[in-house]
Amino acid sequence: MATVTDPRDIILAPVISEKSYGLIEDNVYTFIVHPDSNKTQIKIAIEKIFKVKVDSVNTANRQGKRKRTRSGFGQRKSTKRAIVTLAAGSKPIDLFGAPA
């Protein structure tokens, strides 16, 4: 991604799973991000969208699962995930929109 004006083009969706939900207590959040984005762009986008201080960003490319269909085999879409650690003392991100 050469130039992105909107940080919401980089951060696509939060990952809501049992593992990612357990990591929220440690100020670690997981997001599905644009496949061409790098760690610096992800950090800037998280800080702009949620107004928090990011400590570190780890990324992982997940290969799409091979699935059987009636006519043969297909493949789910591959995704890139970002595991974002917030700085100590930073306010938590409200992913669920419920009052605390």
Swiss-Prot record:
InterPro entries: Nucleotide-bd_a/b_plait_sf, Ribosomal_uL23-like, Ribosomal_uL23/eL15/eS24_sf, Ribosomal_uL23_CS
Claim: Protease is one of the keywords in the record: no
Protein keywords: Ribonucleoprotein, Ribosomal protein, RNA-binding, rRNA-binding
A Pfam cross-reference name: Ribosomal_L23
GO biological process: translation
GO terms for MF: rRNA binding; structural constituent of ribosome
UniProt entry tagged with the keyword Ribosomal protein: yes
GO cellular component, one term: ribosome
Function of the molecule: One of the early assembly proteins it binds 23S rRNA. One of the proteins that surrounds the polypeptide exit tunnel on the outside of the ribosome. Forms the main docking site for trigger factor binding to the ribosome.
Xref: HAMAP family: Ribosomal_uL23_B
Subunit (UniProt): Part of the 50S ribosomal subunit. Contacts protein L29, and trigger factor when it is bound to the ribosome.
Family per similarity comment: Belongs to the universal ribosomal protein uL23 family.
Protein name in UniProt: Large ribosomal subunit protein uL23
Gene name for this UniProt entry: rplW
